[in-house]
């Protein structure tokens, strides 16, 4: 993820 896993 980028913002979230």
UniProtKB/Swiss-Prot annotation:
Subcellular location: Secreted; Target cell membrane
Keyword Acetylation among record annotations: no
Any coiled-coil regions, as ranges: none
A GO CC annotation given for this chain: extracellular region
GO biological process, one term: monoatomic ion transport
Keyword line: Ion transport, Membrane, Secreted, Target cell membrane, Target membrane, Toxin, Transmembrane, Transport
Quaternary structure note: Monomer. In aqueous solution exists as a tetramer.
Family assignment from sequence similarity: Belongs to the pardaxin family.
Function comment: Exhibits unusual shark repellent and surfactant properties. Forms voltage-dependent, ion-permeable channels in membranes. At high concentration causes cell membrane lysis.
Name this polypeptide is given: Pardaxin-2
Gene source species: Pardachirus marmoratus
């Amino acid at each position: 993820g980028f913002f979230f896993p």
